[in-house]
Amino acid sequence: MPITSAASRLGTTAYQTNPIELRPNWTAEDAKIVIQAVYRQVLGNDYLMQSERLTSLESLLTNGKLSVRDFVRAVAKSELYKTKFLYPHFQTRVIELNFKHLLGRAPYDESEVIEHLDRDQNQGFDADIDSYIDSAEYDTYFGDSIVPYYRDLVTTGVGQRTVGFTRSFRLYRGYANSDRSQLAGSSSRLASDLATNSATAIIAPSGGTQGWSYLPSKQGTAPSRTFGRSSQGSTPRLYRIEVTGISLPRYPKVRRSNKEFIVPYEQLSSTLQQINKLGGKVASITFAQ
């Protein structure tokens, strides 16, 4: 079932249906559906050419020689997967993708990333892949027959954490989006939030709103202004509004450019109205102090 009434706006509607499973007495057509679902999930919805298909593994699954779990394992260990995700990405980004592709969630804390970094360095990539698929977590949610899915985007019951839902939207950028065609490229999406154990803001997926084109400043700050006002108000509490997509002539015609406004609480509402008049999209509102 959907975890939020905003499922259609957040791009999670596709996950309101039951997971794809290879049930007893399955047919060749059922196996074909499972194969396509595994490719979509494990390869991050990246385009797969006919010549790239792992036909020998597909045949083993279709003939009942491989379980769904073992097919997922084989795809994740394949040279195809390594070429798409291991070789071109930073290691922390690879671990984020492994969590997403194999466990259907984002890392919950930095200790999980450190654990997999250590295993990859000391035992190798294949051993690290095994640690996801042979885990009690994988067994509980997917077992031998269910294709992994983004389980933190739907209500699955016990064991879910709110931080997993919000962080999923830094990795999941919409049903039609590919993990190899995102604005942030090969860099980690969650390293900063995990290192500081801070909450992750939800940014709507690609195509849903213009918020998807937002990227935070790499220096952690953005150019500031207050529409000509003083940032001092009657209350000491200030708010930082980070904005993308301002479209007036004096602003650069770059959708990813962002600007920061520091305002007191009393001016928050009027500032938001002015941002709207300027054609901007609010990416985040946080306490400035």
Curated annotation (Swiss-Prot):
Top-rank taxon: Bacteria
Record-annotated CpcD-like domain positions: 236-288
Region Disordered: start-end pairs: 213-233
One of the protein's GO biological processes: photosynthesis
Compositional bias of kind Polar residues: 216-233
Membrane protein topology class: Peripheral membrane protein
Subcellular location field: Cellular thylakoid membrane
Keyword Glycoprotein among record annotations: no
Function: Rod linker protein, associated with phycocyanin. Linker polypeptides determine the state of aggregation and the location of the disk-shaped phycobiliprotein units within the phycobilisome and modulate their spectroscopic properties in order to mediate a directed and optimal energy transfer.
Family under the similarity heading: Belongs to the phycobilisome linker protein family.
Protein name: Phycobilisome 39 kDa linker polypeptide, phycocyanin-associated, rod
Taxonomic path: Bacteria, Bacillati, Cyanobacteriota, Cyanophyceae, Nostocales
